């Protein structure tokens, strides 16, 4: 029998980021209770040998599943050590892959407090606004001028530890070009 390949969209990730992500998810599920309804599935509960963990996040009828893998083929670089993350949106029998920015937006819409459109109107009219955004990772673009003024007025509180962000999990901190300077402070030829 010949080998059959199955191709998935998987984001290559540093294994320490996966450990940090899993511990943040568990903290907010069991300690702070901000991620109530989320389900963490260990590697020994999965029948697939490459899956290291799964986090199921209910979004109304649908759910978001963040699957972390180990033992994958290594990448082009030395630090791509075979760890990865896939992000899947499921509704009944339909499933599709989503990017980290969209995953953060979906989590933000369903779970964490944010400014409503009415909050901007209330602030302009001089009424008291008590809401604040708890999940800054869910905003992937610059808001309106009124929104920016409102965020300057009401500072978001810092949550320790931070809420788990899918975009932060898959960000590529290794491939960013390093700024190098010679001893006089000038850019060298091999730097960017």
UniProtKB/Swiss-Prot annotation:
One of the entry's Gene Ontology molecular-function terms is: metal ion binding
Compartments where located: Host cytoplasm; Host cell membrane; Virion
Q: Which stretch carries the motif HCCH motif? A: 108-139
Which residue intervals are annotated with compositional bias (Basic and acidic residues) in the record? 170-185
The segment annotated Interaction with host APOBEC3F runs over 14-17, 74-79
Region span, RNA-binding: 75-114
Predominantly, its location class is: host cell
Which keywords does UniProt give here?
AIDS, Host cell membrane, Host cytoplasm, Host membrane, Host-virus interaction, Membrane, Metal-binding, Phosphoprotein, RNA-binding, Ubl conjugation, Ubl conjugation pathway, Virion, Zinc
User: Residue ranges of region Interaction with host APOBEC3G?
Assistant: 40-44
List of residues that carry Phosphoserine? 144, 165
Q: Which Gene Ontology terms of cellular component type are present?
A: host cell cytoplasm; host cell plasma membrane; membrane; virion component
Membrane topology of the entry: Peripheral membrane protein
Which region ranges are annotated with the description Multimerization?
151-164
Specify where the region named Disordered lies, as residue ranges. 170-192
Entries under Pfam families matching the protein? Vif
Q: How is it modified after translation?
A: Processed in virion by the viral protease. Highly phosphorylated on serine and threonine residues.
Q: Where does Zn(2+) bind?
A: 108, 114, 133, 139
The family assignment reads:
Belongs to the primate lentivirus group Vif protein family.
Q: What else is known?
A: Vif-defective viruses show catastrophic failure in reverse transcription due to APOBEC-induced mutations that initiate a DNA base repair pathway and compromise the structural integrity of the ssDNA. In the absence of Vif, the virion is morphologically abnormal. HIV-1 lineages are divided in three main groups, M (for Major), O (for Outlier), and N (for New, or Non-M, Non-O). The vast majority of strains found worldwide belong to the group M. Group O seems to be endemic to and largely confined to Cameroon and neighboring countries in West Central Africa, where these viruses represent a small minority of HIV-1 strains. The group N is represented by a limited number of isolates from Cameroonian persons. The group M is further subdivided in 9 clades or subtypes (A to D, F to H, J and K).
> What protein is this chain from?
Virion infectivity factor
State the taxonomy lineage: Viruses, Riboviria, Pararnavirae, Artverviricota, Revtraviricetes
Q: What gene does the UniProt entry assign to this protein?
A: vif
